[in-house]
Amino acid sequence: STFLYTEPDSCIGFWVALEDATKENGCLWAAPGGHKTTLRKRFRRKEGGGVEMITLDAMPFELHNMIPLEVKQGTCIVLHGLLPHYSLPNTSGRSRQAYAVHAVDQKSHYPSNNWLRTSAMSIL
């Protein structure tokens, strides 16, 4: 996963629509079968401070293959850590609230340069 990297990859995301999610209000878009590809980028802490996005595989995403995940309020979308996904700007004038939770396998290695951690953090 780009933002919650583990070795081996184990991140799963749960995205719950608190309101209907449509193309107009910024629903998620995803690449069918994209979870079968390699990780393309990784967000990590830089030595000396700050964070950076590094490229692991420079092959561009084929955005024309992405499909909208329009869902009704209460729907839970489960996202594999390697699945390319994004949302576009909300152009509707109404909100699109969602609740997201991510989980990783405690047996996977969570590198010390992952961006999400505190100096005393031990999540695994």
Task: Pin down the residues of each PLM region.
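Low-complexity, flexible helical/coil segments
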Residues: 11-19, 47-56, 66-67, 110-121
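Sterically constrained small-residue positions within well-ordered secondary structures
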Residues: 5, 60-62, 92
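Non-heme Fe(II)/2-oxoglutarate
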Residues: 43-45, 73-78, 82-124
